Swiss-Prot record:
Pfam families: Sod_Cu. The lineage of its organism: Viruses, Varidnaviria, Bamfordvirae, Nucleocytoviricota, Megaviricetes. Its EC number is 1.15.1.1. This is Superoxide dismutase [Cu-Zn]. It comes from Paramecium bursaria Chlorella virus 1. Its cofactor is Cu cation; Zn(2+). The keyword Zinc applies. Zn(2+) binds at H93, H101, H110, D113. GO terms for molecular function: copper ion binding; superoxide dismutase activity. Cu cation binds at H76, H78, H93, H150. It comes from the Viruses.
Length: 187
């Protein structure tokens, strides 16, 4: 006397076999390995921006030249990785929660609001910092989007006008690149 109908028993056995097969095929994947991404800017403003997961934050390493010396430049992740019309086709700041613009330490901000990068006397920005809002997987994933460098300083949403709450009054887009998976993820 069987406790389960034959058809149900067969389906249960098949389900268990599928689970075992899936477990064997994914056992070589290292899901705990941090994801890394890179954006390569080309043109008058050129260089690299690297993104690496570190615990609950993402480390952002900037190495960009061609900037105005001794000046802060707005620095944002924009929605689209589409650069068919230069930096203008990257759309608005990445803002999946529909919030107002702010600085990287603001409680209310776009996910893509990374504040400013500071150029040295030679027009170069080379340093690292961390952000806790951008991610390299999930809803706040920035891979496939664009990193954009602006001509002016981002006022971090404190400019007192509507444009400040939208863009930080950061001005013209002077450099951009699509953020893609870095080779460290694969080889």
């Amino acid at each position: 006397m069987s406790l389960l109908p034959t058809g149900t028993l067969i389906l249960l056995v098949l389900f268990i076999l599928v689970l075992i097969t899936m477990t064997k095929n994914t056992s070589s994947l290292n899901v705990t390995k941090p994801v890394s991404a890179i954006a390569v800017l080309e043109g008058p403003v050129k260089g690299t921006v690297r993104f690496v997961e570190e615990s609950s934050k993402v480390k952002i390493s900037v190495d960009i030249s061609g900037l105005k010396p001794n000046r802060k430049h707005g620095f944002h992740v924009h929605e689209a990785g589409d650069l068919t019309d230069g930096c203008t086709s990257a759309c608005a700041h990445f803002n999946p929660f529909g919030t107002a613009h702010g600085g990287p330490d603001s409680k209310i901000r776009h996910v893509g609001d990374l504040g400013n990068i500071l150029a040295d006397k030679n027009g170069k920005a080379k340093y690292s910092f961390y952000d806790s809002m951008i991610k390299l997987r999930g809803k706040c994933n920035i891979i496939g989007r664009a990193i954009v460098v602006h001509a002016d300083t981002d006022d971090l949403g404190l400019g007192g006008n509507a444009e400040s709450l939208k863009t930080g009054n950061a001005g013209k887009r002077i450099g951009c690149a699509v953020i893609g998976y870095a080779k460290e993820n694969f080889c």
